[in-house]
Amino acid sequence: MKGILDSILRVGRMIFAPTKTVQYPEEKLPLAPRTRGRIVLTRDPDGQERCVACNLCAAACPVDCIDVVKAETPDGRWYPESFRINFARCIFCGYCEEACPTSAIQLTPDVELADYRRGFLQYEKEDLLISGEGKHPGYRYWDVAGKTIAGKAQDPVDPKDLCP
């Protein structure tokens, strides 16, 4: 009898408690700022692509969902002729963002990627490339690439000199 009364009281309290459900498409819950969602390719402040087609993002990807084809400009700079991500396979781990030396590939908090056909989840370079600088405004890879640190020796280091 006591168990039945406890159950009735519990149900009675829950009837008048505020609801915890949200009508999703109309109302959205706030996401954490570090939510890993859709992947984008960013640009330099000059408007050039940051990606140098080094293929480190594809090598770091544990599910092999990134495909990069490298091309070269007449001045010798590498760029991705083709950059494809298969979001049907992507697990949004963020390893590609960590591996990128130019901060070109970044994960955004946009998590709404659902589609009815798997083929529509393969994004090409044109779909991924945004006009902004992403999380690192003002960063230019080519301004810091290959520059020496002031006060450091520029000669090659002999490993024998490092041994005790």
UniProtKB/Swiss-Prot annotation:
SUPFAM superfamilies (UniProt xref): 4Fe-4S ferredoxins (SSF54862)
One MF term in the entry's GO annotations: quinone binding
Cofactor entry: [4Fe-4S] cluster
Membrane topology reported for the UniProt record: Peripheral membrane protein
One GO term describing the cellular component: plasma membrane
Binding site for [4Fe-4S] cluster 1: 51, 54, 57, 100
PANTHER family given in the database record: NADH DEHYDROGENASE [UBIQUINONE] IRON-SULFUR PROTEIN 8, MITOCHONDRIAL, NADH DEHYDROGENASE UBIQUINONE IRON-SULFUR PROTEIN 8, MITOCHONDRIAL
Protein name: NADH-quinone oxidoreductase subunit I 2
Native source species: Cereibacter sphaeroides (strain ATCC 17029 / ATH 2.4.9)
Gene designation: nuoI2
